[in-house]
Amino acid sequence: MFKLGTIGLLSLAVLLRIAFFLFGVYQDEHFTVKYTDIDYQVFNDAAWFVAHRKSPYNRDTYRYTPLLSWLLLPNHMIPWFHFGKLIFVLCDLATGVLILQMLKKLKSKYRYGTDRMTIMAAIWLLNPMVITISTRGNAESVLCFLILSFLYCFLCEQYLLGGLLFGLSIHFKIYPIIYALPIAIYVAAAHYNKTQSVFKSSFKLFLVGFSTLIVLILLTVFMYMLYGDKFIDQTYLYHIYRTDHRHNFSVWNMLLYFNSALPKTSELSKFVFLPQMIIVLAISLTQLRRPSSFPLLCNVLFLETFAFVTFNKVCTSQYFIWYLIFLPFVLYNTRISMRRGIVMLVVWVATQALWLRQGYLLEFEGQNVFYPGLFCASVGFFVSNAWILGQFIEDTIIQNDYVYRIEPSESRSKDSAVIDKPAIAKTEKAE
């Protein structure tokens, strides 16, 4: 059987991205429907304003940190419109390299085998959805790189640097703040398991929290001094009151559509955060009931992100890679059978396809399919994602209650988890 080594995997990943990138440039020049994401045009225009000593928020619909517009300044200095895409592709590849490095680190710490590392890393590096999103000029790959960077620092017990990067990732896009509680539990419990003093354990937790807050405060104050209230409103507050109902998979899609016709004083869209936050908090707290380990942290972050995206009032295709970065770690020791995994994948793809069909009829054919077509498609996608989330929650419980056990050997640290072969056999028989 052909085995693709690390070098081969990375080489193939680079070649695929080059091919997608070049095809995108060709399509933009020769086809009516453009390959480049419309958001990339927004980033590019905002960078143009910055290059001319103006605010990036002079560009309508720019609702991101100014750092993103600064990142694309070379577009207007070289000048080359597509240069920013190369930055996003490099972040995409760097994320894949981090996945490989983290799996290698886990190999020594948690006795991970080498046979599945390449396969797990390929989930990101060879994923056509991931490649398409970065080569089209979507900036999510930058955020994914930041998230895995601070997780890698925590894995290596570099808590100061990890906290700084965590703060930067929250500034870049606010949703990673939901990771604060699981990270706090992991840092505190990991050192408690190592029988360190309460002072040392508390100091590590303080170090992470302090460094995170320092970065957030400094960046927020600095950007506010440069761009004023527009920065706060467009970067953060907008995502609370936004009512986007186009290109939106969310089950709240129809609610937002009708809400957009109501007076601006309507508070309706703010309440859709409530079920989302309750579920995310509940998932975070389940970590308290189990021994702390880095694999468990990755599982919890995956579940949090999956639930956050599923219940979010705005859900687009690029949001999916928010949880795809954790999938290699979740699937490494999954107890989900191959058959069930295929069913989950088919359901996830099929319900997306049904929604995209309705979206095509609406956007390109001009048909009024908001109800029942688009509404039913959104409900179907939501229900399928809720079922898939339940499967992964069950899998996480099985992994940590049966698959992992704390090794009593004095030769290894007490937080090191190993595969419990008898437990695996027992669960397989039970299934």
UniProtKB/Swiss-Prot annotation:
Entry protein name: GPI mannosyltransferase 1
Subcellular locations according to the entry: Endoplasmic reticulum membrane
GO BP terms in the entry: fungal-type cell wall organization; GPI anchor biosynthetic process
Residue ranges, annotated region (Disordered): 410-431
Keyword Membrane set for record: yes
Name of the coding gene: GPI14
Main enzyme class: transferase
Membrane topology: Multi-pass membrane protein
Hydrolase in keyword set: no
PANTHER family named among the record's database cross-references: GPI MANNOSYLTRANSFERASE 1 (PTHR12886:SF0), PIG-M MANNOSYLTRANSFERASE (PTHR12886)
GO molecular function, one term: glycolipid mannosyltransferase activity
TM regions (residue ranges): 5-25, 80-100, 117-137, 142-162, 165-185, 205-225, 268-288, 291-311, 314-334, 342-362, 369-389
GO-annotated cellular components: endoplasmic reticulum membrane; glycosylphosphatidylinositol-mannosyltransferase I complex
Source taxon at top rank: Eukaryota
Pathway as given in its UniProt record: Glycolipid biosynthesis; glycosylphosphatidylinositol-anchor biosynthesis
Keywords associated with the record: Cell wall biogenesis/degradation, Endoplasmic reticulum, Glycosyltransferase, GPI-anchor biosynthesis, Membrane, Transferase, Transmembrane, Transmembrane helix
Coiled coil: none
